[in-house]
Amino acid sequence: MNQRTDPSTLPPSDTELAKHNGLSATLPFALVHVACFAAIWTGVTSEALVVGAVLYVVRMFGATAGYHRYFAHRTFETSHVGRFLLAWLAQTGAQKGVLWWAAHHRIHHQRSDQPGDVHSPVTGGFWHGHVGWIFDPELSPTRWSRVRDLARFPELRFLNRFWLLPPLSLALTVLAIWGWSGLVVGFLWSTVLLWHGVFTINSLAHVWGRRTFDTPDHSRNNPLLALITLGEGWHNNHHHYMLSTRQGFRWWQFDITYYVLKVMSWFHLVWDLRAPPAELMRAQVRPAVAVLTPAQPSAVLR
C-alpha cells in the first residue's frame, strides 16, 4: 500500500458512465428503504436493535472522521494502514467511494450556497440539498482533479472503484452472525438512519440553527444535529475554519468524533490534529443570529 502513482497518470474521466451510474445509485437507495419493511417478517429482536445502534455509531464515526475530516479536509494525519482502514470503515456506510465523496465535498466548500454548489438547499431546494444531488447523473463521476493528493494511492482508487465491497462485506457478516433480523434491523435500519443523519448536515445545517461566525454561506450551528452526527452539527464553525479537526470550538460544544480522534492520538494512531487559530476565533466571533433568519455573507475565508 506504500506504492504511489504519479498524479499525471490519474484514471480517465468516467463521464460516459454518468447516466448509468445515476440510475445505479437511485435504485439501490430506494430498495434499501423498501427492504427495511422486511422486519415485518423477520421480527425485531433486542439483539438486532443493539447491533443496529452499534453499527450506526461506528459507521457515523467512519463518515465524520473518515469521509469528512480526513479525506475531504485532511485535518489530521495517519499511517498508510490507518488511511486504508478509515476508508474501509467510511465506505461501510455505503455513501460511495472516499475519492468521490471528498471531491464533491471540496467543490461544496469552494462554492458553498452559491451557483455550482453540489448540494445547497439554498440554491437547489431542500430535497436536492438533502439527497437529490446524489442521483444527479452529472455528479456521478469522481472529480479526479479535486483529489489528486488522494488519488496517488492505489488502495484508495481500488476502494473508490469497488465502493460497494465494504458495505456488502459488512452486510454478509451481520447476516452470518445475527441472521435475517440482524441484517434487516441491524444493518438496513442503521444504514438508512446513517444516510439521513449525514444528509441533514447538507440540508438542515444550512437552514436551521444559529450563526456564530460571518461566513459567506448559510451554514448554521445546531446542537441536535451535532448529537446525531457525533459533532458535525457545529457546521457554521466548520465553514468558518474547515481545517480544524475539532468542529465544536467551545468547551460546551460536544464533538464526539474529535474526542475519539484525540484518544486515538494518545496511542499514535492519528496525529497532527488541528485547531482553529486563536486570532481567528477572536476576530470573527459575533452575536448569534436567530434561528431560521437569512444569513448575510461577508468576506470569503480562504
Which sequence ranges carry the predicted segments?
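Non-catalytic, topology-defining segments of multipass membrane proteins
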Residues: 1-200, 204, 244-302
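Active-site-proximal inter-transmembrane loops
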Residues: 147-154, 208-234, 239-241
